[in-house]
């Protein structure tokens, strides 16, 4: 089991637009492809921060799902073109994590 903690920086004034877009378009699309989204959050004080966690059974599953999502025509033509206006892609931070034995989320 592995997890991705994904942290994004919104472009100024775009947080609400990003949250609407990811919840209406990105998360449903990715979950339909088989990705498991654990949750998503916005910063309480840091209003430009968006964080979400995805879970994968294995590295092989992660690689397969990345290919199915990011190489799809839907992603390339409908999703990706909108992302640039909402988040600063150069500041995306992805931390890969493994649960500890006592973790409530495994």
Q: Model-flagged regions — what are they?
A:
Residues 1-4:
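Short structural boundary motif marking the start of a folded domain
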Residues 7-8, 43, 48-61:
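Accessory recognition modules or surfaces
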Residues 10-12, 58, 96-99:
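Non-catalytic surface loops within mature trypsin-like serine protease
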Residues 89-91, 97-106:
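Acidic/histidine-enriched, glycine/proline-rich intrinsically disordered or flexible terminal extensions
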